Amino acid sequence: MDIDQIEFKTNVFVLALRDVVVFPGMVVPLFVGRPKSMNALNAAMKEDKQIFLVTQKNATEETPTIDNLYQTGVMANILQLLKLPDGTLKVLVEGVKRFELLALNDEENFLTGDIQQVESDEQLDNDGVVLVRTIQERFQDYAALKKKIPSEVLKSVQKITDPNRLVDTISANLKLGIEEKQTLLEILTINDRLEHILKTIETEIDLLESEQRINSRVKKKMDQTQRNFYLNTKLQAIHEELGDSSEDGVSEFTRLKEQIEQAGMTKDALKVAEDELKKLKMMSPQSPEANIIRTYIEWLVSIPWKKRSRVSKDLNKAQTILDKQHYGLEKVKERIIEYLAVQKRVNKMKGPILCLVGPPGVGKTSLARSIAEATNRKYVRMSLGGVRDEAEIRGHRKTYLGALPGRVIQKMKTAGTRNPLFLLDEIDKMARDLRGDPASALLEVLDPEQNKAFNDHYLEVDYDLSDVMFVATSNSMDIPEALLDRMEIIDLAGYTENEKLNIATQHLLPREIKEHGLKQGELEVPSDTILKIIQTYTREAGVRLLDQSLAKICRKSLKEIVTNEAKAPITVTPDTLDKYLGVAKYRFGLADETNQIGQVAGLAWTRVGGDLLRIEATAMPGKGKNTSTGQLGSVMQESTQAAMSVIRSRSKELGLPDDFYEKQDVHLHFPEGAIKKDGPSAGIAICTAIASVLTQIPVRSDVAMTGEITLRGEVLPIGGLKEKLLAAARGGIKTVLIPYENVRDLAEISDEVKEGLDIHPVQWIDEVFKIALESFPNVENDEISAISMKDAEMGKLVANKQSTKEIQKKSPKRH
């Protein structure tokens, strides 16, 4: 029987549908997998190929009851039935008429039911005719927005004249929920159905237009590089459309606001932070600019604005800490104690800016750490070696991609307090290039009048550095003058043998034993062994190589104990030292055993301390040509020319013929030619070497000298006296000649350095010849100084620096 002729029918095969509603006139493919549903289809195919389709209320129920099925369904024709490889069925059905389910029979193999055709009012009034036309137009608008409705469906909708067929076709092509579609299926009055479908279309059009607005806004905010953030930005735009914002955004904004309020910023910084926070609130969290502003605010709140360490004012405690961790260095310790003493009386004072100048290994960096502990300050270190970009100090503008504050602000954040001890390590190793001069940028940091308003390029707000205690370290005075002027220079010259011995015994050896896991009593290194290491295995101003040598002894001793090559305790004697450190690298006492013609020991200052400078001269028949070799700088070459002029002016006193310079060539050589040499302080040594080779009088091998020479033969003062005296002592020199005006410097040099040295101040080159040469021919000037460290007059000169007219001269020191 044709479905159109059925009004009531019993025992109709029932197919329960999940998540789909079939309308009359629809051709729908269905996938069927439940056994009873497949049996019902197979049975219907054998009979009249008709089946009743009804939707489940709860799609998860496997065996539905009549209570779980909607009352209204569709009687359909089975057009095609296919069996799939997995045993399930694919069926193509066409909905024909709406029927009402009256009863449901759950038989053994399938479901059957009693159904009755639904009678509906199909009479259209005038409003209904208008509704049909409006629905067709609005559906066309919907299709234009949706852009997924097939053109065949659009043409079909425009040609439909049956209002029920129109509603069914449109309902099938709208993206609606199951309940909404079922409602449209169940409405009986045609006018009500038309009004309902029109309202549904209008709602869908509004949603599509809102989505288009959201998409348009999102695309405007995005550029090509941010396509990966599209979905997140779209979600944010949806929240904005609803007048809401994400919970994460609210919590982040609140957190930043609280941090700004608690940071204790200055008024200017607070205003900038609040303005930036307002900008951040108006932005999408995923936009690149929002990340820049967020990072900027986090930097502002993370640096210390008001938190301070409580500076210790206990002078005894500070002295104890400094003495415990460092041997000697009395001038530095005294300066720190003076600073603490002033702080005891004055609440607010400018932080001192100290510069520790000395060769490597004398303990500059470790001393800064001890000062921080003694004053109870946080310790931060910034290495300036090789820094050549101004932005390293002041930072980059925050508009640059990946910009950060300069290292000064970064280290202040690390310190966590606004009054740490800030170590500027290797300040003399800074360079400069096209990107700027970092030394000039440091002027603002180290100037007490300016650093209370230090302006980092990234922060762009003033930050107060006036409470910071700056300590710089340097190997030399080769620092820009403007920077040098802002620092208090404290000279750390090299250690004496006795100081090195004490440092090794009290600090280095116990530390190395502990770090290498040796137990107490397993290794003994007597003082005479350490002294031999100092004399024959190291030649340095500091103690770094000494520390490495002791570490090597500890390693080898531990290996012997662990491998049972030796039993503890192991005692390293001077005789067994080569077993642990190999053959001695240096010969203690560099002075020659015999006096030599034309060979003089000069004294030089280097960045790593003092050193002996060997000078050789030889003369040969020629035409008066003077040659200098040994990688000499321009200043030293000029010194050789001045020295030759001095010799020529004193040819009579030296017993030389007037035309000696026309018949002899003189060659000056400075051994270790791979090392560059420069400076004026070798003037008197060069003069002595030339005088010796021309007169054939040997130079005393136990004499070393330093001093600049003038054309009149006057000896001018030099710098680095302590380092040079230490070098003389290390080289086994007994007698040292120094410029007369350097006598005043002896007062600041410890007696330990001066012990064992016979120091002679000299004013004129004739005095040098008198002492350095074995003999002095034709001496006409008896006013040669015979002052030495053994004379009582030396004590008077040192005690009363202004006692003679010569010492009152203010000649500048020269290196």
Curated annotation (Swiss-Prot):
It comes from the Bacteria. ATP-dependent serine protease that mediates the selective degradation of mutant and abnormal proteins as well as certain short-lived regulatory proteins. Required for cellular homeostasis and for survival from DNA damage and developmental changes induced by stress. Degrades polypeptides processively to yield small peptide fragments that are 5 to 10 amino acids long. Binds to DNA in a double-stranded, site-specific manner. InterPro entries: AAA+_ATPase (IPR003593), ATPase_AAA_core (IPR003959), Lon_bac (IPR027543), Lon_bac/euk-typ (IPR004815), Lon_lid (IPR054594), Lon_proteolytic (IPR008269), Lon_Prtase (IPR027065), Lon_prtase_N (IPR003111). One of its GO terms (biological process) is protein quality control for misfolded or incompletely synthesized proteins. It comes from Hydrogenovibrio crunogenus (strain DSM 25203 / XCL-2) (Thiomicrospira crunogena). Its EC number is 3.4.21.53. Residues 594-775 form the Lon proteolytic domain. It catalyses: Hydrolysis of proteins in presence of ATP. Residues 12-205 form the Lon N-terminal domain. ATP binds at G358, P359, P360, G361, V362, G363, K364, T365. This is Lon protease 1. HAMAP family: lon_bact (MF_01973). Gene3D superfamilies: 1.10.8.60, 1.20.5.5270, 1.20.58.1480, 3.30.230.10, LON domain-like, P-loop containing nucleotide triphosphate hydrolases. Induction: By heat shock. Belongs to the peptidase S16 family. It is an enzyme of class 3 (hydrolase). GO terms for molecular function: ATP binding; ATP hydrolysis activity; ATP-dependent peptidase activity; sequence-specific DNA binding; serine-type endopeptidase activity. Keywords: ATP-binding, Cytoplasm, Hydrolase, Nucleotide-binding, Protease, Serine protease, Stress response. Homohexamer. Organized in a ring with a central cavity. GO terms for cellular component: cytoplasm. The active site is at S681, K724. It is found in: Cytoplasm. Its main location: cytoplasm.
